[in-house]
């Protein structure tokens, strides 16, 4: 009898849960519906290593190169690289290939943990760009081209810039404007597009960084599209990047035992984009349009919308829910949805973020709508905003260094406040 991790996973799948968290495929139904069930049936037999004919991730000549060229054509870039260490590995390699050891890097203050790890590995000096704040929710908004221009003028030694867009909440910076600014200073722009691999294919969402002049773009294909968790793609989009230097860094960062299951899922995702992309993305957008229209009718429910932003644009495949008017924090709302077997991605203060993906069905959105309506009806109608705990009241009189001062304290992915009692 399996225990631990396996037992948990089997128990969870037995709930027939609705997934509004990564990965984007949302389970096996998408693969089976599109005719890829045979791969799932033989998945254990496909777990191999670099046998003859299987190519080599770090010296591609055959089937892996073909898949990389598939992505190169799909995204319209100069070169694409498969990643089996996620976008994290791609960001680290891209930064180390763009900044000399001991050099300086301009980075948005809300960058992913991987960027800070790259600073350590490359002995790189950070120059922080501060995003605008979305004051209502206390979350990071856009990083502006003016902020990047100011920093590049003040720090001419910093020749590379990295920032996330979309960020975790779906807020997108003006990548075209930032790229123009960075290139006017003869710099390199690296975009962490972990949350935006779908933007290239959805005309009603913000423009993809691949179409906005970024030099390196890293896409977490698994987050919103159809590949397996931990699979991603790095795109090189200009002549400013030395491919041999980048490839050398990728070899240093990535595992020497790359998973053929992850790479195969990237291959299948590429096929899905080419053969079924138009219909899938059209249905995805239609489902979102219906959801937002119907959700606006639910009393006490707010959603972060493009009109709410201080600047930039909004990737509305991230549904940011707020029921604080009914006395529910994001964490409380999450627990109410879990009771109904609906699992979401992220809570921050009053926000509960539902990450939609290419595998979500119309029924998923209908179940979420029904659950939100039910929750709204069971809660009081009073305007009881959830307040943050005053920081001064919670601050200890005496502070001390961590018991392990060498360990970074960087939040990423699941950022959860204290649970409500």
Predicted regions and their residues:
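Conserved N-terminal alpha-helix of the aminotransferase class I/II PLP-enzyme fold
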Residues: 43-86
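Short glycine-rich or small-residue beta-strand-to-loop segments that form or flank ligand, phosphate
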Residues: 54, 81-83, 161-164, 352-355
